[in-house]
Each structure stands twice: as structure tokens, then as C-alpha cells.
Amino acid sequence: MKYLLDTNIVSETIRPYPNKNVQQWLSEVPSGLLFISVFTLGEIRRGIEKITDSKRKNHLLLWLEQELPNWFGENVLPINQEVAERWGYLTSILTQQHQLTAIDTLLAATALAHNLKMVTRNIKDFDVPGLEVLNPFD
């Protein structure tokens, strides 16, 4: 099985006290089976830009620009035609009760297009037909 990591999973790895269950799960899965979306990088960058402490901000920028590319390498997935079409389909069938953000539906579409299991803390954010979801925090 291959996995698409949500932003909250990637961000957990840089926290001062990361969740032990997430750490254990990540250590048990070969890194070649872990993928992220370009949108995850964008969400992380957006969060970093809001930080006012320049030392922390610079530390996180270094992590984003150097460590994450080393960790994921070629496993950073772009938005291609198949993902875009699946996203269009998903947004057309999901009702107002789902309240999924554009980024969450793009991540779901990416996971479906690449046959990946979505890994997130926010299971309810990925209530999408056909999408397998895993919460390593539990």
C-alpha cells in the first residue's frame, strides 16, 4: 500500500513533541511508499509565512526547502489532468453537508488518481466515495 500524507501528518514531524503513534507509523512505512501533494507544500509555506519569530520562521523554511525535498524526492505529486478531472467529479457529487475545502478535495482526488490511501488526523474531512483513509494518531 502507498500513502498520501495530509499536511497535518507532515507538520507533526517538525513539532517539538510529535505524536508517538505518528512517529511509530512513519518509522514502520518505507519512505518510498509515502507521497505528498504540491498543495501540502503550499499549505506548509502559508503557515510558515504567518510566523513572526524570525528564528523559527527561518528554521521551518530550511526544513521546507531542503529537508522535505530530501525526504520525499520524486514522491511530491503534481496536479495533472487525471487529478483535475477527479477533483471536478468529486466537487460535483459532494453535497453541502461534506463542507470539504478545495485543497482537501484536491488531496482526495490526488489519492484516488494514484491509488493511494489518505493519511490524516482529520478523517471527517476526507469522507469521499472510494477513498481509503488512515489516522495514525489513534
Model-derived features with residue positions:
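Short, well-structured N-terminal submotif of metal-dependent ribonuclease cores
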Residues: 1-36, 49-66
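Active-site neighborhoods of divalent-metal-dependent phosphate/nucleic-acid chemistry enzymes
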Residues: 46-52, 70-118
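Generic structural signal for small/hydrophobic residues in well-ordered secondary structure
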Residues: 6-7, 22, 44, 87, ...
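Residues that scaffold the ATP/ADP-binding catalytic core of kinase and kinase-like folds
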Residues: 12-13, 25, 47, 87, ...
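Histidine- and aromatic-rich ligand-binding microenvironments
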Residues: 5-6, 37, 99-101, 122
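Acidic, PIN/NYN-like endoribonuclease modules and their adjacent C-terminal/linker elements
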Residues: 1, 108-138
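Short secondary-structure boundary/capping segments
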Residues: 1, 25-28, 67-68, 76, ...
